[in-house]
Amino acid sequence: MLSEDKIIALYCIVDDMLKALRHKEDVRVRVSDSEVITTAFVAALYFGGHLDYARQFMKCKGYAPQMLDKSRFCRRLHRVSEPLLVMFFELGQYLKDMAGASDYVLDSFPVAVCQNVRIKRCKVLKGKQWHGRCAALAQYFYGVRVQVLTLHGVPVEFCLMPGRENDYGVLQRLPFHVAPESCIYMDAGYTHYQTEDLAFDADAIHLMIGRRANSSRPDEPHIRYLKERMRKGIETTFSEIKAKMLRCIHAVTEKGFLLKVALFVIAFAFYKII
């Protein structure tokens, strides 16, 4: 629910983190980077990612009386995209350090840039690498696969992959900066025995991957039940994130589309800690 307290809390957290990161901005700016990022969070959390609605809301309510126009705001948001990602991973690392050896869940969900019938006319994304299939929904999509590592329902790491790539490819992309003896639960789509053994031998991280019926490493019944039980929570997290998205994410460039998708995950993580 949209409330003044939550918006102010988001701004305070963002502003404090930017100061801690020693982020520098031009002394001539009328709207600070903290206000730009907070407005983007408000857009993702309450306006389905519609930046212009959030921009007008922040100006009308007096949260950012010197708000930029639509074009300049978009340029400023792209300019702070790197500090935005740094803030997210710093927040995630702080939560992981506090948790110590804990249980994590890794899974993915698809985000389509358009409906399948409009793929040929789509100008935001181009190429066969964006064609993917969602096994859970038993349907094809054209867009990105969002890989998210969660701790008690809060995203702490994520990455965006082309829809065509398999889930186990994320095992070489995410840093997995978790404490030794931590367990990361995943479904059978992440099966890769070599990476599983390497993670345990090198970092003492247990990759608790679900097993297929024909797996050469079958699980005991109690281990299979534990893996299935632990993975259920992330579906609730994904439902909450996707509920904040519109049916179609409006963007005119590839970078803009990817930034908006990332914003939904990052804003949700900050929202959960308030």
Located regions from the model:
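Short alpha-helical elements
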Residues: 1-274
